[in-house]
């Protein structure tokens, strides 16, 4: 028999206190099934569970509509982006060019923004500015029991 174990705990350190609080308030049985956390600047916090998107409020309630769900700010996006890159963007050129970085526990943080190209390197992606959204994919461990 195989059991899946979520590695969501590895992304808590990346999240801002407000976003972390909302995610940690989701009941554990649902929280462990989260596959993605979606953060879009100026839009509502959402999570994906079994390919279905839910919005999350401050109390961790999962909702099918926006309702009183948490609104993601520019500060949330910038802080989480910087934490994913350990405040050292210049050390991660390859990851920036790919559009995602693998963080602790095998989780991935994908990002969307405006590419800054380097003409000296055949217009390779040098950096990304104006980050507008982040998608955190939660890794799973398969445990044989």
Language-model region placement:
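N-terminal accessory targeting/assembly segments
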Residues: 1-106, 116
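Charged, amphipathic alpha-helical linker segments immediately N-terminal to NTP-binding catalytic cores
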Residues: 103-141
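Conserved small/polar residues in nucleotide/adenosyl-binding loops
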Residues: 143-145
């Amino acid at each position: 028999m195989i059991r899946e174990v979520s590695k969501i705990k590895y992304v808590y350190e990346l999240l801002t206190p407000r976003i972390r609080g909302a995610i940690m308030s989701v009941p554990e049985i649902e929280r462990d099934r989260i596959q993605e956390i979606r953060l879009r600047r100026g839009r509502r916090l959402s999570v994906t569970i079994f390919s279905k998107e839910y919005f999350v409020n401050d109390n961790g309630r999962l909702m099918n509509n926006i309702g009183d769900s948490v609104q993601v700010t520019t500060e949330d996006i910038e802080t989480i982006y910087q934490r994913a890159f350990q405040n050292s963007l210049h050390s991660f050129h390859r990851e920036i060019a790919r559009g995602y970085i693998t963080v602790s526990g095998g989780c991935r943080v994908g990002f969307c923004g405006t590419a800054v190209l380097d003409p000296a390197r055949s217009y390779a992606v040098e950096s990304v500015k104006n980050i507008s959204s982040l998608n955190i994919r939660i890794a799973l461990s398969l445990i044989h029991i």
